[in-house]
């Protein structure tokens, strides 16, 4: 069990000490060798597998703590670990180790007429603060990604996942020690008091460079409202799929059922289905039947109700609701123009997909829809750093900063300029 500290000044003292240790660890970590970082990551993966029984036992305690509460099934799913998920956690860390090291990469270079040679080079951000709720796997993903990018990280888990996160964190520290890297490079806040979150949002006396929240809408909204440091975040995953009249119906059914029902509680799950009005007679009923057969509840627009009067009517609130459950809103729209208008009105700018064979429809969708991730003829559940080949992700960002979409190792870097001269002076 994590230690507890009474709220008040002691929390600030504790958190500022954590910040100082993280900042001190970030300095040598910023120029640690690729070999040392990869050695630590592989040792972390080994430790997670070796301690699987302990991790699962601690996770069982976390799950027991929420028995009898009115938690959504999606919440319980995010909190739950099993043999497969622990193995995937270790595999994800190894995948991060296998990635190219972004630190020191020359991302642009040019010569000036005066002979100066200029390079733009990737550098670590410094210290990342990650605040998360019911996802114990974030402990491993965030710790590994930050390490690979040369950053120290301060992890603050929710009380619901505290035992699981502590067990995983112990494995990460073993990996750091085995590779001779600073053990304070990955720290887990040892208290569940919410004052610790407030301290992190204030930046821990200048120690934290970026905050990444992973959790529900209320957590993310608080972080975005109160943070005094930059934030990489998305408020919610209100994802849409538009099915054009040109879409292959069998493909559309397969994609939509997967996008909704594979895992209903993740931010990449589709929440609204938009069907081309020109396809009511060919596509709408098969799509509704496929979703219903898969166990999904449908909230239907007036036009959809005319075709399927037994469905539950959608309210205005439904179009802006992230269900995180086996529920989907369905509307008929006036072609690609209607789909874009609906998405612009209700989207959270996370992930949208178009199912179509008409290249002009796809091109317009990709040009005019301004969400972080756009897919053509593929499930929205591919909105994931691992699926993008990033090894894992620390989160999905929907803002307009340099980190947008899955936040992987490259997005956890900044850059500096190196300018080589031969005695030039400015006239």
UniProtKB/Swiss-Prot annotation:
Pfam families xref list: Aldedh
This protein's GO CC annotations: cytoplasm
Subcellular localization(s) per the UniProt record: Cytoplasm
Pathway: Amino-acid biosynthesis; L-proline biosynthesis; L-glutamate 5-semialdehyde from L-glutamate: step 2/2
Entry's transmembrane regions: none
Keywords annotated in UniProt: Amino-acid biosynthesis, Cytoplasm, NADP, Oxidoreductase, Proline biosynthesis
Catalytic reactions on record: L-glutamate 5-semialdehyde + phosphate + NADP(+) = L-glutamyl 5-phosphate + NADPH + H(+)
Gene3D superfamilies on file: Aldehyde Dehydrogenase, Chain A, domain 1, Aldehyde Dehydrogenase, Chain A, domain 2
Keyword Amino-acid biosynthesis: yes
Alphabetical list of InterPro entries matching this protein: Ald_DH/histidinol_DH (IPR016161), Ald_DH_C (IPR016163), Ald_DH_N (IPR016162), Aldehyde_DH_dom (IPR015590), G-glutamylP_reductase_CS (IPR020593), Glu-5-SA_DH (IPR012134), GPR_dom (IPR000965)
EC numbers for this chain: 1.2.1.41
GO annotation terms (biological process): L-proline biosynthetic process
UniProt GO MF annotations: glutamate-5-semialdehyde dehydrogenase activity; NADP binding
Record function comment: Catalyzes the NADPH-dependent reduction of L-glutamate 5-phosphate into L-glutamate 5-semialdehyde and phosphate. The product spontaneously undergoes cyclization to form 1-pyrroline-5-carboxylate.
Family per record: Belongs to the gamma-glutamyl phosphate reductase family.
Protein's name in the database: Gamma-glutamyl phosphate reductase
Gene: proA
């Amino acid at each position: 069990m994590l230690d507890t500290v009474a709220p008040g000044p002691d929390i600030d003292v504790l958190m500022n000490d954590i910040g100082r240790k993280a900042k001190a660890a970030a300095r040598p970590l910023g120029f640690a060798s690729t070999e040392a970082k990869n050695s630590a990551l592989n040792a972390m993966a080994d430790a997670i597998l070796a301690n699987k029984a302990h991790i699962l036992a601690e996770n069982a305690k976390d799950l027991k703590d929420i028995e009898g509460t009115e938690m959504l099934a999606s919440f319980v799913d995010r909190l739950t670990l099993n043999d497969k998920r622990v193995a995937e956690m270790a595999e994800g860390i190894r995948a991060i180790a296998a990635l190219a090291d972004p630190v020191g990469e020359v991302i642009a270079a040019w010569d000036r007429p005066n002979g100066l040679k200029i390079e733009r080079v990737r550098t670590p951000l410094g210290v990342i603060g990650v605040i998360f709720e019911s996802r114990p796997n974030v402990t491993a993903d965030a710790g590994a990604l930050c390490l690979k990018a040369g950053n120290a990280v301060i992890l603050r888990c929710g009380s619901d996942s505290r035992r699981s996160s502590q067990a995983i964190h112990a494995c990460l520290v073993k990996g750091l020690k085995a590779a001779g890297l600073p053990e304070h490079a990955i720290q887990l806040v040892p208290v569940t008091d919410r004052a610790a979150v407030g301290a992190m949002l204030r930046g821990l006396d200048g120690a934290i460079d970026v905050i990444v929240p992973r959790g529900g809408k209320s957590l993310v909204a608080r972080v975005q409202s109160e943070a005094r440091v930059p934030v990489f975040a998305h408020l919610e995953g209100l994802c849409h799929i538009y099915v054009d009249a040109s879409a292959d119906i069998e493909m559309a059914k397969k994609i939509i059922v997967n996008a909704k029902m594979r895992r209903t509680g993740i931010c990449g799950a589709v929440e609204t289905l938009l069907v081309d009005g020109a396809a009511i007679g060919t596509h709408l009923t098969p799509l509704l039947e496929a979703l219903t057969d898969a166990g999904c509840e449908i909230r239907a627009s007036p036009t959809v109700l005319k075709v399927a009067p037994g469905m539950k009517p959608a309210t205005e609130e439904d179009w802006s609701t992230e269900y995180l459950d086996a529920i989907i809103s369905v509307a008929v729209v006036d072609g690609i123009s209607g789909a874009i208008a609906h998405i612009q009105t209700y989207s959270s700018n996370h992930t949208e997909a178009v199912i179509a064979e008409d290249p002009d429809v796809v091109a317009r969708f990709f040009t005019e829809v301004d969400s972080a991730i756009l897919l053509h003829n593929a499930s929205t559940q591919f909105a994931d750093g691992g699926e993008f080949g990033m090894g894992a992700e620390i989160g999905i960002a929907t803002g307009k900063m340099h980190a947008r979409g899955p936040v992987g190792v490259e997005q956890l870097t900044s850059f500096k300029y190196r300018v080589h001269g031969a005695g030039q002076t400015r006239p």
